[in-house]
Amino acid sequence: KEYTSVSELRYGRLMIMTDADNDGSHIKGLILNMIHYFWPSLLKLNFVVSMVTPIIKATKASQTKSFYTDSAFRTWYGDGKQGWKIKYYKGLGTSTSAEAREYFKKIQDLTVKFDVDTMTDDSIVLAFDKKKADARKSWLLENTAKDADQLEVPYGSVKQLDISDFVHKDLVNFSLADLKRSIAHMADGLKPSQRKVMYACF
């Protein structure tokens, strides 16, 4: 069905709430791919949004600073900040009930809308179409040469995000991380998880 207004729906929007890690980005991508395949017109209506949460928090006495990207944190932290306590958030489960309430109080500020752009169709097809495996290999190879800052969406400072930017600056990090943890290293024949088990045994 071709939708022209969200008033035709029972809900005004679909909000994705995932962990702020690579696997969370993969889930976002899968949902966007599903909507794009079955109901592409909904993407043009900004029906799909995402709520971002901090990946790092720094506290000192009554002061709290939240960071949504590694680069933003590194820029602020520099060579160290005396007296500041740093907490890393692996996922939503790391947050306390009080922090969850805090996020929902600021939900308007933490919501990012996904926008359709001229590269949306090609980007989603590249990332998910099984017929594009060879193109995907080239895509991943090209991105291994990029700096981390080039493969990062400035969450926390953007309210709208082109879907192609999401694919090429966020989702790609899941694919690169998945390769690292899924393919055995040529030096020892082990995957990272297996190597950690071996390390813990001795």
What are the functions of these language-model segments?
Residues 1-202:
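Conserved phosphate-chemistry cores used by DNA topoisomerases
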